């Protein structure tokens, strides 16, 4: 294998070893679902695409048999390291949360979960 390929693989392995993940769950009440889904499509996706420190992300609609009074959505953000995640939380997440609160008030609740991979197979 060429030396540059070996170096590239080593860099990828190092990145995944140090990666840091943030799971943001948005709970929307059933009365605001249509407006929230429009906001996701028109605003949240664009904001996420423009995040410089986010390596990869997954935006999902969460299915649950236990939630009847609304719906959950999840934004899984993958950072190269803990510091980038912490910087995001201190600035961008605060900004996103304030925008959502201003537009939706208590109708959309935000829950953050810090995921610290022990092992991954990405």
What are these regions (language model features)?
Residues 30-32, 83, 118-119:
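Residues that cap or initiate secondary-structure elements
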Residues 32-59, 95-99:
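Short amphipathic alpha-helical segments
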Residues 49-55, 78-113:
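An amphipathic, aromatic/His-enriched active-site/gating alpha helix that lines ligand/cofactor pockets
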Residues 4-12, 58-71, 98-122:
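Glycine-rich beta-strand-turn "strand-cap" elements at beta-sheet edges
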């Amino acid at each position: 294998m060429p030396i540059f390929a070996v170096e590239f693989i080593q860099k990828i392995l190092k990145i995944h070893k140090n990666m840091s993940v943030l799971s943001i769950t948005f709970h929307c009440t059933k009365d605001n679902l249509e407006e929230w889904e429009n906001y996701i499509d028109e605003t949240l996706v664009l904001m996420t695409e423009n995040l410089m420190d986010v390596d990869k992300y997954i935006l999902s609609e969460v299915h649950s048999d236990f939630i009847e009074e609304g719906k959950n959505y999840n934004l899984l953000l993958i950072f190269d390291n803990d510091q980038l995640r912490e910087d995001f939380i201190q600035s961008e997440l605060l900004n996103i949360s304030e925008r959502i609160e201003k537009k939706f008030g208590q109708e959309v609740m935000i829950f953050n979960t810090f995921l610290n991979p022990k092992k991954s197979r990405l």
